[in-house]
């Protein structure tokens, strides 16, 4: 059928999209669960402002990631929500701070510790300050300001240690989750604060999350995919349609071009 034909003939167009992504200094990525023949599988996207690529995956782990050509070649910054498997790819990594803000709110509610709200406020303050500088045409933070903000971050982690000693949580599960969160904040401090060092790096991974909504909505409304081939066709078509929208291209003409055997984009 024409969908299978589109999938086959879109290979060159997808390679051009991938090339633009490979040339980008930072790329946002996320994955979502879909069902395939009744079993759990995934769709992952790679997004920048004008280009987006969707990939079908059997699982979310390292083995599946290693089969994605884009990840094998990419040498820039990957922006994601603490997917530790992704740290084997790319040149550097930026953590999504919107997700972190949610975890901090939850931790404060679960443990009643106030360090969470203090760090939440600090991260929001950092982001707002950066936005003001960008609005004034600045390219980076003043060194002294950067040092002050990072020192405040470190102080709050020390404050958290003392607060936990003085006011231990009454719930073992909450204590365990808080320990994991604090370990993450310490180990991945640089990745969470990379947006302060490089103004091209986003504060969050919202772009990639938005680009996955169609996949999530399809799963809710239509259910999963019957076959792996069907999921791959869907990813190809979504790659073409979503990129065409970003580029302001007419979809009908774009489909005609691909079905004629030609490719889109330079």
Where are these regions (language model features)?
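Catalytic center-proximal scaffold of phosphoryl-transfer enzymes
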Residues: 1-266
């Amino acid at each position: 059928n024409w969908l299978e034909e589109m999938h086959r003939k879109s290979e060159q167009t997808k390679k051009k999209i991938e090339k633009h992504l490979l040339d980008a200094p930072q790329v946002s990525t996320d994955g979502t669960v879909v069902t395939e023949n009744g079993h759990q599988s995934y769709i992952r996207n790679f997004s920048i402002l004008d280009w987006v690529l969707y990939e079908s995956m059997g699982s979310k782990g390292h083995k599946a990631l290693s089969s994605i050509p884009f990840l094998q070649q990419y040498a820039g910054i990957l922006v994601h929500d603490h997917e530790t498997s992704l740290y084997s790819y790319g040149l550097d990594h930026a953590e999504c701070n919107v997700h972190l803000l949610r975890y901090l709110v939850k931790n404060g509610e679960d443990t009643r510790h106030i360090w969470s709200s203090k760090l939440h406020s600090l991260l929001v303050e950092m982001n707002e300050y950066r936005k003001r500088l960008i609005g004034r045409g600045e390219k980076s933070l003043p060194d002294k300001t950067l040092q002050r903000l990072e020192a405040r971050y470190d102080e709050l982690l020390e404050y958290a240690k003392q607060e936990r000693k003085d006011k231990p949580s009454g719930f073992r599960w909450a204590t365990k989750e808080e320990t994991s969160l604090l370990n993450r904040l310490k180990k991945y401090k640089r990745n969470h604060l990379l947006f302060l060092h490089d103004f091209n790096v986003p504060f969050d991974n919202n772009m990639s999350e938005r680009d996955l909504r169609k996949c999530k909505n399809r799963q809710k409304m239509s259910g999963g995919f019957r076959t792996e081939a069907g999921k791959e066709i869907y990813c190809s078509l979504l790659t073409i349609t979503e990129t065409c929208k970003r580029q302001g291209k007419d979809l009908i003409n774009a489909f005609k071009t691909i079905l004629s055997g030609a490719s889109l984009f330079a």
